[in-house]
Amino acid sequence: MKVLAKTKQAEKSPAPWRAVPCGDTKPIYIYSAYSEEEKERFPYSNGRLIAAVFDLSSYSQKSNASLMAAAPELLEASKAALDFLKGNSIHSKERIIQLLEKAEASAAPKRGGNKT
């Protein structure tokens, strides 16, 4: 069986991801961090645009954008929790709880500031 080589296109965008509101009538943009290589090429950029979340309703737009931006933390926490439950974790129960709480907080819509 032929094994496919891992390409840069198959990798996820580097964490952290963040939701950036751009005003009442505009989408919320989701940016990822740049890789080390990209940081050298684009030293003054804010990151890589990976998604635009348009307004269905003000609340759902914020919620959807926050959830999308929290994807790396949610993935990290779910992998750590799964390893812990399988008995393969190097982390303590307390560390797993911290990761899960951080992921939950990251996924919560942000309040205040711009109404987007």
UniProtKB/Swiss-Prot annotation:
Q: What is this protein called?
A: Phage-like element PBSX protein XkdD
Q: From which source organism is this entry?
A: Bacillus subtilis (strain 168)
Lineage summary: Bacteria, Bacillati, Bacillota, Bacilli, Bacillales
Q: Which gene encodes it?
A: xkdD
